[in-house]
């Protein structure tokens, strides 16, 4: 009987993590090799990274330079963002092209914000996603923080890689 209690204590959290993690950005398929040690944050490495990513057959490229891969498509035609004043709930992880994580949501809860209150690359991508989608975004500098960068976390003129899971859309009145 005691052994069963021990097994229950060991396996219950594992099952919980597996089930609860299904909507998290970290739970998306591995993206090893997308960003990492092969790239530094120099301008030349940034250009090489963008070219390498664009050459992948599963990447969708938009005219303004935003690129993405659909890692998990929504099971149905879920709600989509309609305007910049809509609020979304997402799980995400943002990295530089060298693989350094600069921001991410907490695993237990998504974050929410107005679609128009984020960098242009995010706004554009969110308007294309459906609730339930998980995408990998590659956002070029001019759709991110451009020559300004963002404090010590994001140097100027950096492309950014995001893993994004859209969990909810609330329409603005």
Residues of each region from the PLM?
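Cross-family detector of peptidyl-prolyl cis-trans isomerase
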Residues: 2-173
